[in-house]
Amino acid sequence: MAFLIHLLVCTFGMGSWVAINGLWVELPLLVTELPEGWYLPSYLTVIIQLANVGPLLVTLLHHFRPGCLSEVAVVFTVLGVGTIACTLFAFLWNVTSWVLGSRHSIAFLVLTFFLALVDCTSSVTFLPFMSRLPTYYLTTFFVGEGLSGLLPALVALAQGSGLTTCVNVTEISATTLSPETTRNMDSPQGASSTLVSKLAGTAPSGIHLESRYLPANFSPLVFFLLLSFMMACCFISFFFLQRQPKRWEASIEDLLTSQVTLNSIRPQEGKDLGPPEESGKAQDPPEEKTAPQHLAHLTFIYVLVAFVNALTNGVLPSVQTYSCLSYGPVAYHLSATLSSMASPLTCFLSIFLPNRSLPFLGVLAVLGTSFGAYNMAMAVMSPCPFMQGHWGGEVLIVVSWVLFTGCLSYVKVMLGVILRDHSRSALLWCGAAVQLGSLLGAVVMFPLVNVLRLFSSADFCSLQCSA
């Protein structure tokens, strides 16, 4: 029975971010298909953070009107909306509309908002629900949350999304064009574009390389249908989890009974040590000393949670195309997918190698931040980053993204475990810190990418960088 509950909890955790993680790993294909192009990741980052209105509303209601929200009903609503939105994505992802004189993926962006609303709200609804379960199920939940990145990444690897080839293109100077001149640019899933010309009176003026996107093994329609299936599995898992509260309530009652027994014994033990007044006086000073330390302890944890999530959910995702795509589509594809796989593997590792030491977690956060700084530096140097055109540069950027995600994922998991042992409300505020950090990261990066345009893009095949 315990194994079944672990399986249900893992599947339930998978639904927390599977939809948005699915969008991120599909980006190598989507940036070639949608009119936003290289700017698409920064658009997604801002839209995802705008969806923080969901967790903000839930947090405020919990604080000012505790008990007014049915926890189970909210989770069911979140999972239902996520399943429906993923299904609509499969059929509307490439629908574009004219806005302000140019084409934009309005349907894609609107559905992204609803998916983000689901996933962001899960941070302040799923974790409080997990407080009903024994502590050891929380690690299983984080493993499932990590699988929300692993499974879409595996599907994206099988899809082979966003891969390109370089082809020679001959430029021609036309003097007289025959009526038979045609240019075929229709290519579902980024298939290679071809130029077929039957020209009269033309002369070649030059040859250069251009990128041509190879067709994926299966379309985004299939990919998004698989995402909707994963969300449906999460919905079903939660249905069975919330229908078995009696076992957990019984275990809580047993725990409370044992605490009552211990409390009834402790005064008797105190009588042997001296008068109650003296023992009470002796205990007061340590409590006064530890209160500020306890506050500083929690403050450090919440600040670290916000900082780590600002990097992983707001700052670095906005510039992943710029830091990776200059090294080629393969480097971008592997960085997006393998870094998504690093998160669940790190969560799984934390089961066997847990370390709750805050100094250790602080050092690990600094290490992960250093890898993030390298990724950001390569994005700033785009389209000619360090070792561009050399296989060593491709390896470095992929490894850097994997280690960046892995280090900070471990920090996030262990901070969540620490707060789970503290109290139920601590997990709620942990979710709020997650979303606040993510929001700040996105708000900082969007104007840098889309307004000031500090990052430059280029065609990989025609790119010429000085040695």
UniProtKB/Swiss-Prot annotation:
Topology, Cytoplasmic side = 1-2, 65-71, 127-137, 242-294, 355-359, 416-425
Provide the family line. Belongs to the riboflavin transporter family.
This protein's record includes keyword Chloroplast = no
GO BP term, pick one: riboflavin transport
Q: PANTHER family attached here?
A: SOLUTE CARRIER FAMILY 52 (PTHR12929), SOLUTE CARRIER FAMILY 52, RIBOFLAVIN TRANSPORTER, MEMBER 3 (PTHR12929:SF4)
Please indicate the ranges of residues that lie on the Extracellular side. 24-43, 93-105, 159-220, 316-333, 381-394, 447-467
Regions of biased composition (Basic and acidic residues) lie at 268-288
Against InterPro entries, the record matches this protein to: Riboflavin_transptr
A GO molecular-function descriptor = riboflavin transmembrane transporter activity
* Protein's UniProt keywords contain Cell membrane: yes
Chain positions covered by the region annotation Disordered: 266-288
Q: Provide the residues annotated with a glycan attachment (glycosylation).
A: 94, 168
Its transmembrane ranges are: 3-23, 44-64, 72-92, 106-126, 138-158, 221-241, 295-315, 334-354, 360-380, 395-415, 426-446
Q: Which domain of life is it from?
A: Eukaryota
| Protein name as catalogued | Solute carrier family 52, riboflavin transporter, member 3
The subcellular localization recorded is: Cell membrane
The record's function comment reads: Plasma membrane transporter mediating the uptake by cells of the water soluble vitamin B2/riboflavin that plays a key role in biochemical oxidation-reduction reactions of the carbohydrate, lipid, and amino acid metabolism.
Topology relative to the lipid bilayer, per the entry, is: Multi-pass membrane protein
Q: Which reaction does it catalyse?
A: riboflavin(in) = riboflavin(out)
Could you tell me which residues carry Phosphoserine?
A: 251
Q: Which UniProt keywords apply?
A: Cell membrane, Glycoprotein, Membrane, Phosphoprotein, Transmembrane, Transmembrane helix, Transport
